[in-house]
């Protein structure tokens, strides 16, 4: 490519000295330069720009510092994976649209940036792009060995073990991805209240046991100690946390929003089905990924690597074919998602997520179930 870049200049010098009588000599290099300049201008005009909020830029800088300077790694699998974050955002967006009263009978009348359907498409597109891009452009060299290990078939429990453990374990990671569990609705119903109290009693003991572990593991023990310790759920859904939903129920259920949710759902008579649809929506089917293969990166990695994608995303989108209208709508939804990450960055970007390479290796040798 360097040779091609120098050729026009050399040819032009020769023609200036002795090629004045060649009528078609000058236009060729001049025309080529004009074409190249025009191509560069077109590329600049088509360049996709995704501004990253300053607070998230700082998170990227911190991420680079922890990985490259302090030689740390993100502990995998993450408690809150990329799929859960995207699913959480779509529900957040949908609930906000419902709260704003934007319930047009014909979806095409809604502005693109307020379209729940486009929001869901954006989230699914990010998930797919993340799964493909992570091993190619989103990892530092120090993370390659960890990636090879966590994507191996021996890292995760077999499907049968996962299914049997799911019924016994009380320490499943925060929603990966799944709708809110029906424990609160069962507790409100009355008959199962004693059982709930027993669970809370057991959970209350867990933090005392967790103090025996090293400080490096404290974040994991604290996050998984009890349902109340899943900090992101109430913070990310302050209006929806009191709204139970049965994932297997086809008919609408009675909603019992608390003080936080009362303002959110005030005056929403007749919208029970819409609220249920928001809360029960899933980014991927229940049977994904198949049990015979390791989960994709979006089930293993979290916010740290998802944010890295937005650094590479302009280049990736620039190589895709979009109409101006569709690209504008997509960029608007990406901007809204980045604002969401910035607003809740304290929940997603935890310093305690970075552990020593030794501890990261230990967690890889002792894999945890992905739910």
From Swiss-Prot:
Function comment: Probable non-catalytic component of the MSL histone acetyltransferase complex, a multiprotein complex that mediates the majority of histone H4 acetylation at 'Lys-16' (H4K16ac), an epigenetic mark that prevents chromatin compaction.
Transmembrane annotation, as ranges: none
UniProt-annotated stretches for the region Disordered: 1-44, 160-229
A GO BP entry: regulation of DNA-templated transcription
Annotated GO CC locations: MSL complex; NuA4 histone acetyltransferase complex; nucleus
Entry annotated with the keyword Transcription regulation: yes
Organism: Rattus norvegicus
Broad class of where this protein is predominantly found: nucleus
Annotated InterPro entries: MRG, MRG_C_sf, MRG_dom
Comp. bias regions, Basic residues: 206-216
Swiss-Prot/TrEMBL keywords: Chromatin regulator, Nucleus, Transcription, Transcription regulation
Ranges of compositional bias, category Basic and acidic residues: 8-44
PANTHER family to which the protein is assigned, alphabetical: MORTALITY FACTOR 4-LIKE PROTEIN (PTHR10880), MSL3 LIKE 2 (PTHR10880:SF46)
Residue span(s) of domain MRG: 44-367
Protein name: MSL complex subunit 3B
Location relative to the cell: Nucleus
């Amino acid at each position: 490519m360097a040779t091609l870049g120098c050729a026009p200049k050399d040819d032009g010098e020769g023609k200036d000295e002795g090629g004045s009588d060649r009528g078609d000599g000058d236009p060729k290099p001049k025309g080529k330069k004009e074409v190249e300049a025009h191509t560069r201008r077109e590329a600049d005009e088509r360049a996709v720009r995704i501004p990253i909020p300053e607070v998230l830029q700082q998170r990227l800088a911190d991420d680079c510092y922890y990985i490259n300077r302090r030689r740390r790694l993100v502990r995998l699998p993450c408690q809150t994976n990329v799929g859960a974050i995207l699913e959480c955002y779509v529900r957040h967006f949908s609930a906000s649209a419902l709260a704003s009263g934007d319930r047009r009978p014909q979806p095409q009348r809604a502005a693109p940036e307020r379209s729940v359907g486009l929001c869901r498409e954006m989230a699914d597109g990010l998930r797919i792009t993340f799964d493909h891009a992570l091993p190619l452009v989103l990892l530092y060299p120090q993370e390659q060995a960890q990636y090879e290990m966590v994507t191996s078939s021996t890292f995760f429990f077999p499907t049968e073990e996962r299914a049997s453990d799911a019924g016994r374990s009380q320490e499943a990671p925060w929603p990966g991805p799944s709708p809110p569990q029906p424990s609160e609705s069962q507790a409100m119903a009355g008959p199962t209240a004693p059982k709930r109290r027993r669970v809370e009693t057991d959970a209350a003991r867990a933090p005392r046991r967790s103090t025996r572990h090293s400080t490096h593991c404290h974040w994991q023990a604290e996050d998984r100690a009890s349902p109340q310790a899943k900090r992101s759920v109430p913070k990310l859904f302050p209006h929806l946390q009191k709204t139970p939903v049965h994932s297997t129920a086809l008919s609408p259920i009675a909603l019992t929003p608390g003080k936080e949710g009362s303002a959110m759902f005030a005056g929403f008579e007749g919208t029970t089905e819409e609220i249920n649809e928001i809360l029960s929506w899933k980014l991927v089917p229940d049977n994904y990924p198949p049990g015979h293969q390791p989960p994709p990166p979006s089930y293993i990695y979290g916010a740290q690597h998802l944010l890295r994608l937005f650094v590479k995303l302009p280049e990736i989108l620039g190589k895709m074919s979009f109409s101006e209208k569709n690209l504008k709508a997509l960029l608007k939804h990406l901007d809204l998602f980045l604002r969401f990450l910035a607003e809740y960055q304290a929940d997603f970007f935890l310093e305690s997520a970075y552990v020593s390479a030794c501890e990261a290796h230990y967690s890889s040798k002792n894999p945890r179930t992905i739910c």
